[in-house]
Amino acid sequence: MPVAARHLIAAILLSLACPGCDSQTRDFRHQFYAFGTLLTIDFLDVTESTSAAAIAAVETRISKIDRNWYPWSTRAGVPFGEIAEINDAIAAGQPIAVSPVLAALIRRAALLESQTGGRFNPAIGRLTELWGFHDLARLRAAPPDGIEIQKWVAGRASSEYLEWNGNVLRSNSPDVMLDLGGIAKGSILEQFVTILRENGVDNAIIDIGGDLTVVGTVSGRPARIGIRSPRTDDVLAWLEVAGGEAVMTSGDYERFFEYQGKRYQHVLDPRSGYPVQHTVSATVVHADAVLADAAATALLVAGPDGFDRLCADLGLDVALIVTVSGDVRLTRGMEKRLHWKWR
């Protein structure tokens, strides 16, 4: 139901404590810069050796993912990766063998495109490139030519044009270019949870640029997530998140440029070829981090008119969006969990 409010953007404000930790264990915070953002892992009530072993394994995985999941062929200091090789093969109309982990993720992305009615589209790479959002160091100063945008839309790039023979992939559509940015964080969070569990970590919070997942509990309680104003650090509401749940947010504050007083954000509507304008933020809480990641993007594209239907189609119980006018639309599950600061 819509609720009048100031502009909100879901963000993560963590309050961590560990009273009663014994002398052998304590809390550790490790931070890295990876995937173009800040990655923070808060280990709760662990030994130093346990956290160190987990971090070493995470760093190894980061290096592999950062290299292999970048969709474009050139990036300073980064070797040619697997998704870039796949995109080059698709452009050439050639088949290519795909690693099992990435093949499973691409198949999942294609299913999510179908389930969201194309609002999430993993084949949108050329449009992302056209708008310049693939290179944060060189964002555009102005929108691309409208003719080029319409040409991309007319090409109907979609994962439905991917053809599989086992784990060998090909496509007869040269307009298809894979960009898994809309689900990558969700998959990475799930992989990191597995790594932490394998290394004996029972309680932690993993945060990748504001998208997070909770492992276990915080001092025996659910984690508290703050929703704050986009222009200040004021906390407007609190949300409790249980162990095993992920909180994924998509918003117009992550990557954008301004032209003639108008903001152009990185979340693009595949149906029009243009950045989303009606909605500034979408947040989804779900045990399936990949689903939550794609759903946050799809809800941002769907906007207030498509919010209820898409939540029903995807089985989302805890979700909200914030419109450009500052209204909040949320599911009943989200409404029950939120604790408004002013109430």
Task: Go through the PLM ranges and name each one.
Residues P2-I9, L14-R343:
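Mature catalytic core of soluble alpha/beta enzymes
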